[in-house]
Amino acid sequence: MIKLESLQDPSPRKRRKKLLGRGPGSGHGKTSGRGHKGDGSRSGYKRRFGYEGGGVPLYRRVPTRGFSHARFDECVEEITTQRLNSLFNEGEEITLDALKQKKAIDKHAIRVKVIVKGELEKTFIWKDANVVLSQGVRNLIGVA
């Protein structure tokens, strides 16, 4: 037999939807649970993600961790002797701008390093201070 004290709330799926704006007896009349004035009482209002009622939100209370070096990193590219052989002709000057023009390096690069891969089949002019030669390339062309 069912007794009054043994009654349970219906499961959330069977619970009646709360009716808003249907008189003071419903508990959700007049302002329909929205309170008086302010943004929350207006139609179309949605709280910003992380908003905590005007207090300092958690994401601002918790200290930041780590450090990003991206702002200070210099964009240094590398290019092989094999690639230089295919891109440039005999006796051409190899500069940062020439490499950027031929799209051999990134347009944001501020320095390029030449590394050994295969032989250097042609002679080039190396005057640009932003084109750095590795020790192996220096040995190939005979510069100490």
Swiss-Prot record:
One of its GO terms (molecular function) is rRNA binding. Residues 22-32 have a biased composition (Gly residues). The keyword rRNA-binding applies. It comes from the Bacteria. Residues 1-52 are annotated as: Disordered. InterPro entries: Ribosomal_uL15 (IPR030878), Ribosomal_uL15/eL18_sf (IPR036227), Ribosomal_uL15_bac-type (IPR005749). GO terms for biological process: translation. Disulfide bonds: none annotated. GO terms for cellular component: cytosolic large ribosomal subunit. Keywords: Ribonucleoprotein, Ribosomal protein, RNA-binding, rRNA-binding. Belongs to the universal ribosomal protein uL15 family. Part of the 50S ribosomal subunit. Binds to the 23S rRNA. PANTHER family: 50S RIBOSOMAL PROTEIN L15, LARGE RIBOSOMAL SUBUNIT PROTEIN UL15M. This is Large ribosomal subunit protein uL15.
